Amino acid sequence: KPKILILDEPIANLDYKSKFFVIDKVNELSKLNTKILCVTHDISTITKIYDRVIMLKDGKIIADGDQNKVINSENLNNLYGIQVEVTNNNGLWNIKRLIK
């Protein structure tokens, strides 16, 4: 069992069966107290696996905390430069682009 697992875009370009397999394995390791560091642009990955999120822009931390603190309209607007609306309904996240 690894003490630390470092992942870079762990489910990018995978079919859904493979994505769920990876997510399940990462969750299993997390329950065994493996520390997991993951780099990803996929918000849906973050919400299924990780309890702490650090958001970086230009190499600087712009947000750090749990999902509910970090994944919000202000942070995503700042990070990506687009206007979005973020809602969380009992763990079901929805990110909608706002078009002017």
Q: PLM features: what roles do these ranges have?
A:
Residues L5-D8:
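Catalytic Walker B motif of ABC-type/P-loop ATPase nucleotide-binding domains
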Residues D15:
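ABC-family nucleotide-binding domains
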Residues F20-L32:
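Helical segment within the ABC ATPase nucleotide-binding domain
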Residues T40-H41:
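H-loop/switch region of ABC-family ATPase nucleotide-binding domains
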Residues I46-K48:
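A short, surface-exposed alpha-helical micro-motif characterized by mixed small hydrophobic
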Residues D64-G65:
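ABC ATPase "signature
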Residues L79-K100:
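ABC ATPase nucleotide-binding domains
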